[in-house]
Each structure stands twice: as C-alpha cells, then as structure tokens.
Amino acid sequence: MQTALLKPKIIAVEPLGDHHAKVVMEPFERGYGHTLGNALRRVLLSSMVGYAPTEVTIAGVVHEYSTIDGVQEDVVNLLLNLKGVVFKLHNRDEVTVSLRKDGEGVVTAADIELPHDVEIINPNHVIAHLSAGGKLDMQIKVEQGRGYVPGNVRKFGDESGKVIGRIVLDASFSPVRRVSYAVESARVEQRTDLDKLVMNIETDGVISPEEAIRQSARILVDQLSVFAALEGTESAAEAASSRTPQIDPILLRPVDDLELTVRSANCLKAENIYYIGDLIQRTENELLKTPNLGRKSLNEIKEVLASRGLTLGMKLENWPPAGLEK
C-alpha cells in the first residue's frame, strides 16, 4: 500500500500585471491545499519585511492638524499621501531623506532627494499640489520593519517623541498588498482526489510575488523546524548525560563560507574572527571599532547572518569547542 505523501511537482507563475502574479502548485494530497494555502497567506500578510516612512518633520508645522500656506492638501492628507510612497533600502535599516519644493506645481515622490542606496518604486506617486508661492520642506525618516506598527507605540516608547514638530506615523511595513488562494481539483494518473493550490499575490514592488512566496515558505520551515527536532521526556540519566549544549554545525564553519566581500572578510580575520561562532558573539559596537570596517560592511554582515537565522550579540556556552583550530 502506498504511504508516501505526494509533493507538488508543478509550480507555474503567471504574471497578471506589475508586481501581481498567480502562482499554481500541484499536486497535493487531499486537504493539504487548504492547510498550506492558509498558512502561506497568513505569513505573507503578517511577516514580510518591508520599508515605510515612520517620522516626518515639516518646516513651519507643529502638529498633524495644521495647514501649510500655498499647499492644497492639509497636513493630514499630506501624510496619507506620503505613506503611499514605496521605498526600498539597500544595505541599511533606516535613512532620513529630504523633500524640498517651491513654486506652483505637483509634488511627486521623484522630488525626494535620495542617497545612492535608496530607491523609490513609484516615483510618479503624487504627494502634494503647490500653488503660486507655495513651499514644502520636509525631513522623512524611513525604516525597515515587519507588519504594522502604530505610531503611538513608538512615540511613547521613545523619549525623542517629545520633540516639537516631530510627527510619528503609523507604519505598514508589509510589501504584500493582497493575497488570496483557492484550492481546485487535480489529477495524477488514476487519482482524482488531489488538490491544486492557486495563490494570487500582489506586492508593492519591493519584492516580486515569487520572492514573497519563497520568503514566506522559509519562515514556515524555520518555525516548524523546532517540531521536527522534538524529543520525548528524558530520563534523569539521559538528562544528566546531555547537559552539555550541542553546538549548531553552522557555527563551526569558517566566515569565508558567508561569502562576504574581501574587505569585510579581511577585517574580521584581522580581529581573529575565523568562525561564524566567533562572529555572532560580537556586538555591533565591537565590530564598528574594527579598523576599516564601516557601517556598510556591518550591514552586509547583518544581512548575511539574518539569511541564516543568526544575529550579532548572541551568547554561546562552551565556545570555542575543544579541538577547534584557529
């Protein structure tokens, strides 16, 4: 009797427009279409990393209920329009950008002054309309985040929230705008009781629908891995014999396996950081004190570690293990 579960062998991606696609996966055992479709949908909507404006300072404006001479929109509508700008940051977690425009005309996202490692996905997005003599001068803080974070959460958790004129925004970081799924019938040879999973995904352009699916699947696999390693209750003798913490094999690999730039790799070796286990125990401040290792290299290291589920500043017991060569 066949007991092995089927795995999907056909994955098709059908573009439906800019940043919009239909992803079809089949065949699944009966019931798995809904099981996986619902899980992927929830992760896509709640757990994708993205970027959003979080704070704004506008010249001459004290609070969000103000108006600006020469600007058609009041500050509330101005901020709503600003939230529609889609930012993408490269090699950094936050940035402050400027928007300065005067004279009659339309203010769009393309008018925002950007550093070389920041881009705007929708430069034609309208932010405001200026009349003759109108002027707009703004400082916009953009941050990386996950999910939805209300402005009052950051405002009251941050003493700098008391600065007059600083407007803290509700931030929706998710790059996924809409997700839906449907389960249809599939057939393999004589079996007609199988599932076909059809997912309809629209993003804001920071990531593609295909990449969104990949990232959500990795998150699910990572979260479920703890259950795959689940063991029963140990006896007292077994518990005593297993008190020595087991070291994750990835920590024993050399930092060269991270495929960092030559500059970053050389800086780490100069500080006697030869293994990934050595690296994750260092803090950001410690690494920034390393000669020739700047913020750009630090961000590169953080991104590479994050892709493997690791961070800086982790604590390891019994490190280095006996016999580890330097």
Swiss-Prot record:
Function field: DNA-dependent RNA polymerase catalyzes the transcription of DNA into RNA using the four ribonucleoside triphosphates as substrates.
Family, as annotated: Belongs to the RNA polymerase alpha chain family.
Region of interest: Alpha C-terminal domain (alpha-CTD): 247-326
Keyword annotations of the record: DNA-directed RNA polymerase, Nucleotidyltransferase, Transcription, Transferase
Domain description: The N-terminal domain is essential for RNAP assembly and basal transcription, whereas the C-terminal domain is involved in interaction with transcriptional regulators and with upstream promoter elements.
UniProt protein name: DNA-directed RNA polymerase subunit alpha
Record GO terms (molecular function): DNA binding; DNA-directed RNA polymerase activity; protein dimerization activity
Gene name of this polypeptide: rpoA
Subunit structure of this chain's protein: Homodimer. The RNAP catalytic core consists of 2 alpha, 1 beta, 1 beta' and 1 omega subunit. When a sigma factor is associated with the core the holoenzyme is formed, which can initiate transcription.
Region Alpha N-terminal domain (alpha-NTD), residue ranges: 1-231
Reaction it catalyzes: RNA(n) + a ribonucleoside 5'-triphosphate = RNA(n+1) + diphosphate
Enzyme nomenclature, EC number: 2.7.7.6
Statement: the UniProt record of this protein carries the keyword Transferase: yes
GO cellular component: cytoplasm; DNA-directed RNA polymerase complex
SUPFAM superfamilies given in the database record: C-terminal domain of RNA polymerase alpha subunit, Insert subdomain of RNA polymerase alpha subunit, RBP11-like subunits of RNA polymerase
Glycoprotein found in the keyword field: no
Parts of the chain that traverse the membrane: none
Entries under Gene3D superfamilies matching the protein: 5' to 3' exonuclease, C-terminal subdomain, DNA-directed RNA polymerase, insert domain, RNA polymerase, RBP11-like subunit
NCBIfam families linked: PRK05182.1-2, PRK05182.2-5, rpoA
